[in-house]
Amino acid sequence: MPSLTHLDATGAANMVDVSDKAPTARTARAEGTIVMLPETLRLIREGDAKKGDVLGTARLAGIMAAKRTHELIPLCHPLLLAKVRVDCEPDPALPGIRITAEVKVQGPTGVEMEALTAVSVACLTVYDMVKAADRGMRIEGIRLLQKSGGRSGLYEAEPA
């Protein structure tokens, strides 16, 4: 089993020293869903939510969150992100919204946390914008889909 890189020999949490690591191209993709009543999904799709453009706002919130991950997650490095893409797709089969994020960087450490944070905050934003219509919404399945670059190479999640 690999060791936990954020713990020192005494078990204390520390920020990993990446000063000797060469910058490399790194990407990460994550996904999550927010499940809701069919009527709530209809409100979102038809643009009838009282707070405005739910999906556009959630997309921007996810992008902003990725850029601020180092302020939210202890021991996360601040990174100069090259790309953040957040997609919010209505899915009548849930019913709800399927949210995906892709993050890219040329840097010394990966962007998994940035992709996961983008998805998490986008889901929370959807909840906030339509909670008056449906307090029973569920945020589910937030997970890393893929990461590439760095010493550990490629990771791809098993299909859900």
UniProtKB/Swiss-Prot annotation:
Chain residues that bind substrate: L75, C76, H77, M113, E114
Active site: D128
Pathway assigned in UniProt: Cofactor biosynthesis; molybdopterin biosynthesis
GO terms, molecular function: cyclic pyranopterin monophosphate synthase activity
Signal sequence coordinates: none
Any GO BP: Mo-molybdopterin cofactor biosynthetic process
SUPFAM superfamilies reported in the protein's UniProt record: Molybdenum cofactor biosynthesis protein C, MoaC
CDD domains per UniProt: MoaC_PE
Repressor listed as a keyword: no
InterPro entries documented for this protein: MoaC (IPR023045), MoaC_bact/euk (IPR047594), MoaC_sf (IPR036522), MoCo_biosynth_MoaA/MoaC (IPR050105), Mopterin_CF_biosynth-C_dom (IPR002820)
NCBIfam families for the chain: moaC, PRK09364.1
Entry function: Catalyzes the conversion of (8S)-3',8-cyclo-7,8-dihydroguanosine 5'-triphosphate to cyclic pyranopterin monophosphate (cPMP).
Similarity comment text for this entry: Belongs to the MoaC family.
PANTHER family: CYCLIC PYRANOPTERIN MONOPHOSPHATE SYNTHASE, MOLYBDOPTERIN COFACTOR SYNTHESIS PROTEIN A
Quaternary assembly: Homohexamer; trimer of dimers.
Protein name: Cyclic pyranopterin monophosphate synthase
